[in-house]
Amino acid sequence: DLDPHRPFVDDVAIQCPECENTAHRVPEVIDCWYDSGAMPFAALGYPRKNAEQFAQQYPADFICEAIDQTRGWFYSLMAVGTLVFGESSYKNVVCLGHILDEDGRKMSKHLGNVLEPIPLMDTHGADAVRWFMLASGSPWQARRVGHTAIADVVRRTLLTYWNTVSFQSLYARTAEWSPATGAPATGERPLIDQWVLSEAARVARDVDDALDNFDTQRGGRILAEYIDDLSNWYVRRSRRRFWDGDESALATLHEALHTVTLCLAPYTPFIAERVWQDLFRATDDQAPISVHLASWPSLENATINDDLRDNMALVRRVVELGRAARAASSVKTRQPLSRALVSAPGWAQLPDELVAEVADELNVRVVEVLGEEAGLVDVVVKPNFRELGKRFGKHTPVVAQAITDVEPATLANSVRASGSFSLMVDGNSEDVYADDIIVTESPREGWTVASDAEESVAIDLHIDDEL
């Protein structure tokens, strides 16, 4: 048997049938990585042929391999390309982190913790594995892969998307609604409809930008957050409208899901295709025959409303504070209450339609502006001697006394609003910060209050006969 390695191959001599000279092994040996580095042009036979194809493909837009290729293929591609053509053979590179098991150990046959990709896809679906690898975590970091982790991303995002599609399909059929039925113009729909469509346009724009920059994680995060907003805020807040067959709600959810499905297609091609066929092709015979033949969502006629985005974000923060206030008082949301008072920058300018969303969500008759929070909360401010001691040393007792001399609500509100409060200590001005004081707030009897930064919600707990 011929051994093609040195030194045995050195003894091999081949007689040339044409020139009758003897051919021996070339004594110089080039690094085998040169072949890999020459791949972009050698695979095409360039420069002897395929010049036009080479010009279209070189340099490549993107390359990815594991971190160990930094000194291997990544380097040889860059070195050979730069040497021959004066530029690297790729524009963008990602060094993938290693795949670990769920306990953070390197996968190995010895440990018996190797997960084969095909059985993993058979269990969870190819799209679940794709979504996990593309969207959950930075690709350059080591990643723990296991059944639990993949099942979790399916539950939180893909299943939520699927259930929202099923919800739309069910209520559209019940109302005998289709896109051909028509709906009011976007600007004539309720603000919550305008908001969710504005955010859909924002998602299309931002996911497009993320994918153009090869950042699948950012694009996936944007999609996951929007799917959660769509299901757990828009659909939940609009549920009664769907029960009533409201055309505006049905059209809005259909349009939002259309955008989401197109944006999901590069991540989850099989689920997106199934939804495209069942929800969009089934209701529009002019739609492309596949989601993968459809155009990316057009922003030409879309409106991205930043003010509405900020207003809805404020509404949702106030709702969270209201829920926290109710939870603190052990009064469940099922119990109607008379009023909620809100103190927050921008609240007084909020449209009545969005204020009504808060009232309905918190199950109160009215929501009003909270004029003076101190009237509903007993505030106690104590010096934080540990933090004060770090700054003032032996002068800490004097500073602590100056803190206790200030009206508590005034001091607490100032620190909350601006981050500090100026005190006069022995004729000198000293700033007190949030870490320097311990603030305790207790609602007055009959009220429950929750606060965060500059925003507060107070709920009246008095229940009259009607309530």
Regions found by a protein language model. Give the residues of each.
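Glycine/charged-rich beta-loop-alpha catalytic/anionic-binding loops adjacent to active sites
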Residues: F54-D61
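Structured mid-domain segments that build the active-site/substrate or prosthetic-cofactor binding neighborhood
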Residues: F132-A135
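Substrate-binding cleft of carbohydrate-active enzyme catalytic domains
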Residues: A79-V80
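N-terminal catalytic cores of NTP/NDP-binding nucleotidyl/phosphoryl-transfer enzymes
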Residues: I63-W73
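Feature 926 captures the class I aminoacyl-tRNA synthetase adenylation module centered on the KMSKS loop
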Residues: D1-Y34, A38-P40, Y46, V84-A126, ...
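Active-site loop segments of alpha/beta catalytic cores
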Residues: S138
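Cytochrome P450 heme-binding Cys-pocket and its upstream "meander" loop
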Residues: G45-F54
